[in-house]
């Protein structure tokens, strides 16, 4: 069974960026990676990258590759099935290393992938950053798609092409501008987030409202209870507004030399300012 998005829009990149567009697609209900990626015959090599926190949320998809219990899989682990490979890494910022980026590259190399392959990150900003960076290097650049699983990655981290990893004690020191071809968004992933991660994502939402969207500001003011209870319809509206605002900013300032730099602020004061209103 194929799955159809309930909404979509295009992020168009500047002519001089070297990139065309990112298709951003929204889906309803529970995440259905099997229908998205496994329902039709596939002849393309694909590398799916996720982590030990996300694997238990995608048990049907994981069981396509292995009989191991998704809760018990150790990182790093590699599983192969037909033309597809699954790479499971450790979860969290401490795993955002060049070693794990190279683990992704190595998984593709050991699977004998060609330049027509596809990398897919299923996770938050750490996963999309590393997978996008690995895709930019493998065979001098292969296609990449993101399935964001956190509010922060839905509204910010997965959109716009910034990829990379930490190096020694330096955060995001190495990387590349390399946008995804497609971003597939299920707001249902947000229901499983720990409260602190959900609040962190709200910081980006508050910042976007303050900088770009009176409509979003009004939603945050008048529907706070629905926001905090993670109402799916309200979340979809919030994510859509934020994603479109981020897309517009990226189009105007792809290499982060002007207005886009403002998007780096707000992770600290945003959550506090909203949750204490």
Predicted regions and their residues:
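Short glycine/serine/threonine-rich phosphate/pyrophosphate-binding segments
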Residues: 126-132
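Conserved phosphate/pyrophosphate-binding and hydrolysis machinery centered on Walker-type P-loop NTPases
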Residues: 259-262
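Acidic, metal-coordinating catalytic segment for phosphate/diphosphate chemistry
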Residues: 267
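Conserved, helical-rich catalytic subdomain that frames metal- and/or nucleotide-binding sites
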Residues: 228-248, 253-256
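A glycine/threonine-rich phosphate-anchoring loop and its flanking beta-alpha core
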Residues: 16-18, 132-225
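ATP/NTP phosphate-donor binding region
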Residues: 1-118
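Conserved small/polar residues in nucleotide/adenosyl-binding loops
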Residues: 275-277
